[in-house]
Amino acid sequence: MVRTLFDTNILVDYLNGIPQAKTELTLHTDKAISIVTWMEIQVGVAPADQVVLDLFLLGFTVLPIDTPVSVKAVELSKSTRIKLPDAIIWATALVNQRLLIARNSKDFSPSAQGVLVPYII
């Protein structure tokens, strides 16, 4: 069983009804998100959709930003020039030994360490 961490764009795609995101999410049982993804999703939700979002997010373990994640995020941001929120998400996956599943191939190359880009839209 692969332990996964989903990037924000996969969750947004799922909530917007993108079939590839629904398929990808059903393939995995040990699913997590970074607290950064949790915050990004919360900021974008309409009040009328809050309950649905909260129920959806119960299917994920929310991983915090701790010192090892912070150190790794700074290292990734400096070496790859990706934005800090993306570096934090990637670092969270690496430090917690999870496969990062992301659609943003601009920031997360399909050949990057510990990253899977399952589809592009």
Where in this protein do the model-derived segments appear?
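Short, well-structured N-terminal submotif of metal-dependent ribonuclease cores
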Residues: 1-33, 42-54, 58
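Alpha-helix capping/helix-boundary segments
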Residues: 10-11, 37, 69, 88-89, ...
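Acidic, PIN/NYN-like endoribonuclease modules and their adjacent C-terminal/linker elements
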Residues: 18, 90, 94-121
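Short active-site oxyanion
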Residues: 28-30, 59-61, 95-99
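Acidic catalytic patch
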Residues: 58-79
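Short glycine/serine/threonine/alanine-rich loop segments
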Residues: 78, 82, 98
